[in-house]
């Protein structure tokens, strides 16, 4: 009965009311089949990831906060050594990261403020990519306006003494714990929401696996899209504001903002400003089109992004060299900026080319008619421009970008390189998942595309 209700619920919004094709009917039927628990290490892998990832973040935070940025580790690899290490980490978390009323007020005020902007700020109405069954959801793109409203309101509030510029870094650890708890609660609420609305799809029947992967693809309250909001608002802007708060703390404590901190703050600000300027492009990403909304995305969007992506700034504030903040030369800074610009423009140009092609397949690519493979499903796989060189040059640019963000920290510790290591692993895994998904989706057409464009990241190498 639940499967029938789910299917009928989707069919009501499918294909804008038009008659469903046989392919679309099959797509909808496939959503209600039991799906294998075979991603992210299956049932065991998703269970471990759910609980280990927050521990990893606490570990790096404690290393930066209490060990001058050097990674904490057991004195010995014996059972007693590991137990002592975990006991020390537990002490740091319980003593300094215990959730406080102030941290909860700060975060939920922030979350509510961003939800308010998402709901009331006018924006351009656009249709998302076709979903199984042909449905195209309408989105209001007001991120660019909300971004600038936030950047105006926050400094005004600081100027009039509503809170200090250092409020975020002063409450970093307790607020992180608040958000970790909220991520679990929010995911359970998504489970209830999907069940009540009959929107569950691609379920495996294994609790922890489905908790991690998600329940519904596009959960909404009215026209308010929960996944797009969490993906694009509270975590991303909080990440930038956390950097600014750390810079303010460095100025307060040491009387200066180091060039390294300025570079990292500018890099991240530029990246997020560009993200909102090209906001429509998110609607063609794997997260929005394919992924269900579960703990993986909830925790990633709300906690992982703002509390780990600021680690470079955090490290540069806490890591002292001869009692003073780390300084880099102008020449080194120019090298880092050049690398960042190369990675950024590669990332942006490649993604924009794909997005423009999806909007208008007739538009020329590099001055020539676009070449593509027309799949049996009717989808067009772009085979010219950047997408005729490698299948994921956008990931290449993103990886270069991630390491450029870490380089201002120089090389005393691995802690600030957490982002580069993580993001490289993420993109490699995402490439593998994307390949498998496309192989299932397009079959021989995808094999033909891979034969025509054999490399993923670097032409002639990989």
From Swiss-Prot:
Keywords: Lipid biosynthesis, Lipid metabolism, Membrane, NADP, Oxidoreductase, Steroid biosynthesis, Steroid metabolism, Sterol biosynthesis, Sterol metabolism, Transmembrane, Transmembrane helix. NADP(+) binds at residues 354, 358, 382, 387, 394-395, 434, 438-442, 449. One of its GO terms (molecular function) is Delta24(24-1) sterol reductase activity. Pathway: Steroid biosynthesis; zymosterol biosynthesis; zymosterol from lanosterol: step 2/6. GO terms for cellular component: endoplasmic reticulum membrane; nuclear outer membrane. It catalyses: 4,4-dimethyl-5alpha-cholesta-8,24-dien-3beta-ol + NADP(+) = 4,4-dimethyl-5alpha-cholesta-8,14,24-trien-3beta-ol + NADPH + H(+). It is a multi-pass membrane protein. It is found in: Membrane. Its EC number is 1.3.1.70. GO terms for biological process: ergosterol biosynthetic process. The chain crosses the membrane at residues 40-60, 103-123, 143-163, 172-192, 253-273, 293-313, 327-347. Reduces the C14=C15 double bond of 4,4-dimethyl-cholesta-8,14,24-trienol to produce 4,4-dimethyl-cholesta-8,24-dienol. Belongs to the ERG4/ERG24 family. This is Delta(14)-sterol reductase.
């Amino acid at each position: 009965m639940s499967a029938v209700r789910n299917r009928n619920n989707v069919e009501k919004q499918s294909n804008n009311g038009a008659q469903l094709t046989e392919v679309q009917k099959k797509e909808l039927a496939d959503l209600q089949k039991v799906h294998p628990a075979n991603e992210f290490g299956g049932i065991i892998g998703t269970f471990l990831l759910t609980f280990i990832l927050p521990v990893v973040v606490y570990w790096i935070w404690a290393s930066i906060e209490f060990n001058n940025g050097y990674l904490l580790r057991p004195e010995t690899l014996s059972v007693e050594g590991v137990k002592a290490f975990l006991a020390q980490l537990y002490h740091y978390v319980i003593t300094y990261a215990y959730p406080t009323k102030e941290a909860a007020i700060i975060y939920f005020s922030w979350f509510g403020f961003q939800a308010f902007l998402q709901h009331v700020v006018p924006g351009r109405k656009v249709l998302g990519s076709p979903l199984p069954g042909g449905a195209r959801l309408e989105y209001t793109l007001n991120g660019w306006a909300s971004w600038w409203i936030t950047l105006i309101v926050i400094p005004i509030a600081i100027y009039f003494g509503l809170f200090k510029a250092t409020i975020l870094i002063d409450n970093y650890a307790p607020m992180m714990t608040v958000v970790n708890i909220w991520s679990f609660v929010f995911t359970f609420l998504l489970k209830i929401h999907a069940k009540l609305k009959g929107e569950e799809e691609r379920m495996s029947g294994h609790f922890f696996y489905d908790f991690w992967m998600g329940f519904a693809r596009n959960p909404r309250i009215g026209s308010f899209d929960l996944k797009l909001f969490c993906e694009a608002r509270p975590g991303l802007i909080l990440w930038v504001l956390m950097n600014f708060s750390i810079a303010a703390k460095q100025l307060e404590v040491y009387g200066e903002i180091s060039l390294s901190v300025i570079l990292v703050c500018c890099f991240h600000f530029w990246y997020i400003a560009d993200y909102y300027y090209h906001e429509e492009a998110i609607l063609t990403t794997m997260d929005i089109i394919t992924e269900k909304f579960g703990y993986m995305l909830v925790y990633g969007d709300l906690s992982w992004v703002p509390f780990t992506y600021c680690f470079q700034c955090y490290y540069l504030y806490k890591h002292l060299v001869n009692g003073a903040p780390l300084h880099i030369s102008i020449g080194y800074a120019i090298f880092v900026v050049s690398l960042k610009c190369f990675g950024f423009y590669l990332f942006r140009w490649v993604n924009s080319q794909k997005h423009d092609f999806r909007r208008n397949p007739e538009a020329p690519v590099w001055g020539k008619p676009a070449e593509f493979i027309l799949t049996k499903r009717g989808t067009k796989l772009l085979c010219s421009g950047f997408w005729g060189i490698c299948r994921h040059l956008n990931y290449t640019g993103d990886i270069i970008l991630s390491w450029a963000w870490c380089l201002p920290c120089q090389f005393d510790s691995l802690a600030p390189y957490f982002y580069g290591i993580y993001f490289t692993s993420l993109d490699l895994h995402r490439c593998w998942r994307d390949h498998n998904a496309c192989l299932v989706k397009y079959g021989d057409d995808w094999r033909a595309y891979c034969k025509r464009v054999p490399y993923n990241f670097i032409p002639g190498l990989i």
